[in-house]
Amino acid sequence: RQLWNELDLPDAIRAAKLARFDAVECHWPYDVAAQDVKAALKETGLVMLGLNTRRGNVEVGDNGLSAIPERVEEARAAIDEAINYAAEINPHWVHVMAGFASGPEAHKTFVSNLKYACDTAIPHGLQILIEPLNGYDAPGYFLASTGQACDIINEVKADNIALMFDCYHVQLIEGDLSHRLEKLMPIIGHIQFASVPDRGSPDHGAVSYTHLRAHETRLN
C-alpha cells in the first residue's frame, strides 16, 4: 500500500473508509493476522482487491522468488502462503512476484511456478497477476516489459492469469500508455495509477490520467 503507511493494516483500511474509498489493496500483509484484516474489511464494507507474494529475504535485496531456478521450493511456499491468506480475506487477485533473474531457465521456472499458482488459486476463485517492473526502480527484475508478460501469459494457458498494468511502470518502460492499454486490455486484470516520474498522486506529473481514464472507459 502507498497510503497510510504509518498505520497498521486494519487501521489503514478504516482510514480508507473515512477517505471515501470503496476498495483497497496491500502489498505484504503477512505481519498482521488475516482475521484482523478480515474484521476491518467487514466493519468498513470495503473490498480487498489483492496482495503480493512475499519478496523473500529483503535484507539481501530479494524482490520476489518465482523466476529464480534454485529457489522453487521457497517460491511455492510463498505462493501457498499468499493464497491461504487470500482465502481468509477474499481478495480478487494475488500478484506473484518474479524476482531478480534472467535467461531461459528463469523463464522456464517462472512459467512453471505460475502454472502452480494458477492451479492452487482455482478452488478459491482467485486470479493470478504478473506485473512488469521498470529498470530504474528494479534493475534486473525478470519481468521487464508488457510484451514479455503477454508471452508468458499465453504460455501459461490458464483462465485465471492476467496482467497487472501499472501505468507508472509501463510509462517508464515503454511509454505510449493509451495504445498499450488498448492493445493489452484483453489480458489486463488490474490497472494501477501513479504520477510519473515521482510515483505520487496521479493528479500531477507527466501522464494525463484524466485523458487515460476516459480512454479506459471507452475501451470498456
Model-derived features: positions:
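N-terminal pre-domain/capping segments
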Residues: 1-87, 150, 154, 158, ...
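Active-site-proximal loop/turn and secondary-structure-junction residues that shape catalytic pockets
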Residues: 2-4, 30, 54-57, 98-102, ...
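A short helix-and-adjacent loop within the catalytic ATP-binding
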Residues: 41, 121-122, 217
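Active-site acidic/histidine proton-transfer and metal-coordination neighborhood
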Residues: 65-162, 172
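Glycine-rich S-adenosyl-L-methionine
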Residues: 149, 208-209
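Histidine/acidic-residue-rich catalytic or RNA/ligand-binding cores of hydrolases
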Residues: 174-181, 201-208
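Conserved small/polar residues in nucleotide/adenosyl-binding loops
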Residues: 210-217
